Every structure is written in structure tokens, then in C-alpha cells.
């Protein structure tokens, strides 16, 4: 059984790539096999956090979209690269070449692409979780990612613009029959201490808040140089996110569906 999850936010810079990368290694630490996909094709960044160089990425999602390589060519097993003792993490990166980014913006890709990738990862790599790291906002790519996923993890800050946008995003996801769970990120430390915060915010945005991650100076200072919780396993950020990983496992154990897909890419 494979669960597909899209990590998304209405606005940019909410911590999607940071959360995706840290969540992947925490799920692996819990014995899970995880694949993360950088679907922020117009501004990829996940490879930076994973310390995956362009030499390591012989082929990218862009090459696969245009039939220049096989599926196996774009799947990078980074379990050993990250020195993970348990589970597995696979990474599928996007091209950083300007001409490739322009091409995919101009030409787009098939609406079956997300489901095709998830199916391949499920069947050929036996992964438990497929996590799509997306571009922010309510664009076409996002809606495709949402429609192709079992659950959406929406990240938001305690900012009025994020609150309004997250509410709208959740409502749209509901219209597609998709469940969204919300993680509050970069929460000011004084607010994060309030035990009523998750229930209060859940009511306002009409979606379930499953975790709170305070703003930590150390994460900002880390400057995306590696996966934070591998460098700082004892840091409160790592333990808070571990709770979210466990919660996600609980929630998806009951709600995930078997992927039944037949489409071509
Ligand atoms: N809880 C946090 N506390 C402090 N800084 C954070 C936190 N989460 C993420 N960041 C920082 O915020 C910036 C944006 O994060 P990123 O994951 O790149 O966002 P996105 O992928 O949504 O654009 C990065 O510099 C990251 O280190
Ligand atoms: Mg990002």
C-alpha cells in the first residue's frame, strides 16, 4: 500500500521543502520507504537540502517528461548518501537548467504525470510514501498534484494572508474530495505554547491542524545546508516533526487507498 501526499502552501517560503526533506528522513527512521519528488519545477530546491549535486543527478523529471531517459534513470536512492540506518529515501529531482525550466513552463506536462510517477514508485520501488513538494499557490500543477494524491499537507504561517489563503486552498481540496491536514510552521514561540492553538486555528480554516512547528533561529542559520534533523536529532524541531510523522502514519493507515492506475505519462 502506497500513500501519496502533496506538501503544499498557498504562499511561498512557508517551509515546504524543509518539511518535505526532514519528514522523509523521519519517516525512514520509522522504517518507512519514502520517495520525494521536486515538483516545484519552476523553482526547484529540494536537491540543495539533500546535498545532491548536479553530477549525481544524471537525469531529471524534465528528461523523463520529454522521453529522454527511462524511469529508473531519474530515481536516485539517497539512503546511503544521507547515511540513514533504516528505511529508504528516493529522490526525483527537477532540472536547474534555465532552458529546461522555460520549456516545461511553455509546454506543460500531461495531467496523468503525477499518478504515473506514483504508480511507478509504488510498483517498482515498493515505497510506503510518495511525497510531492510543490510550487505554492493555486495553479494548475497544484490541482493536478492534489487530485493525484491521497492527502495534502498544507503548511501555513500564523500570518493573516496565509490563514485566508489556506482556508481557500482547503475548500478547493474539499471540492475535489481530498483531505487536507494543516501544519503551522514558523509559529512565534509565545503563540506556539498555547495548547488551544491547534483547535482555534482548525475552526478558522475549516481543516484539521495536525502539528505545530515553532520558528527556530537555528533552522534559519542552518541555511538549507543539509537535512536539519540529521544534523540536530535532539533539537525540538526534530522531535516536533517526528510527532507529525507519526500522526501522518496513523492518519494515512486508515485513509490511504491502493493506487489503481493505468494511465500513461
Ligand atoms: N520552523 C522554521 N523556523 C525557522 N526557519 C524555518 C522554519 N521552517 C523553514 N524555515 C526556513 O524558511 C526558509 C524557507 O523554507 P523552504 O522550505 O525553502 O520554503 P518553501 O519550500 O515553502 O519555499 C528556509 O530558509 C528555511 O530554512
Ligand atoms: Mg520549496
Please report, for each region that a protein language model flagged, where it lies by residue:
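Conserved catalytic-core segment of NTP-binding enzymes
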Residues: 113-215, 220-221
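Cytosolic-facing regulatory segments adjacent to core modules
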Residues: 72, 81-82, 88-136
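C-terminal boundary of histidine-terminating zinc-finger modules
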Residues: 223-239
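Short, well-ordered alpha-helices that flank and scaffold nucleotide-derived cofactor binding pockets
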Residues: 25, 29, 48, 147, ...
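Phosphate-binding loop that captures ATP/GTP phosphates
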Residues: 33-34, 42-91
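Conserved Rossmann-like nucleotide-cofactor binding loop
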Residues: 42, 97, 161
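P-loop NTP-binding site
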Residues: 204, 208, 218, 239-265
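Walker A/P-loop phosphate-binding motif and the immediately C-terminal alpha-helix
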Residues: 2-42
Amino acid at each position: 500500500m502506497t500513500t501519496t501526499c502533496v506538501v503544499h502552501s498557498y504562499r511561498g517560503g512557508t517551509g515546504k521543502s524543509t518539511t518535505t526533506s526532514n519528514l522523509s528522513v523521519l519517516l525512514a527512521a520509522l522504517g518507512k520507504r519514502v520517495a520525494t519528488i521536486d515538483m516545484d519545477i519552476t523553482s526547484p530546491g529540494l536537491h540543495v537540502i539533500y546535498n545532491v549535486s548536479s553530477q549525481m543527478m544524471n537525469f531529471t523529471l524534465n528528461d523523463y517528461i520529454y522521453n529522454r531517459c527511462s524511469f529508473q534513470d531519474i530515481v536516485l536512492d539517497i539512503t546511503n548518501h544521507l547515511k540513514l540506518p533504516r528505511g529508504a529515501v528516493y529522490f526525483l529531482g527537477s532540472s536547474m537548467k534555465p532552458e529546461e525550466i522555460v520549456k516545461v513552463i511553455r509546454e506543460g506536462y500531461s495531467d496523468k504525470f503525477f499518478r504515473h510517477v506514483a504508480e511507478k514508485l509504488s510498483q517498482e520501488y515498493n515505497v510506503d510514501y510518495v511525497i510531492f513538494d510543490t510550487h505554492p499557490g493555486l495553479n494548475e500543477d497544484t490541482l493536478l498534484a492534489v487530485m493525484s494524491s491521497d492527502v495534502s499537507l498544507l503548511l501555513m504561517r500564523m500570518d493573516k494572508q496565509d490563514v485566508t489563503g489556506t482556508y481557500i486552498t482547503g475548500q478547493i481540496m474539499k471540492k475535489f474530495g481530498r483531505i487536507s491536514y494543516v501544519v503551522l510552521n514558523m509559529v512565534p514561540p509565545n503563540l506556539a505554547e498555547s495548547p488551544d492553538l491547534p483547535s482555534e486555528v482548525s475552526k478558522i480554516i475549516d481543516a484539521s491542524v495536525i502539528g505545530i512547528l515553532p520558528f527556530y533561529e537555528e533552522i534559519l542559520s542552518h541555511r538549507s545546508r543539509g537535512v536539519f534533523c540529521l544534523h540536530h536529532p535532539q533539537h525540538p524541531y526534530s522531535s516536533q516533526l517526528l510527532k507529525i510523522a507519526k500522526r501522518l502514519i496513523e492518519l494515512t493507515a486508515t485513509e490511504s487507498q491502493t493506487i489503481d492506475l493505468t494511465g500513461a505519462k
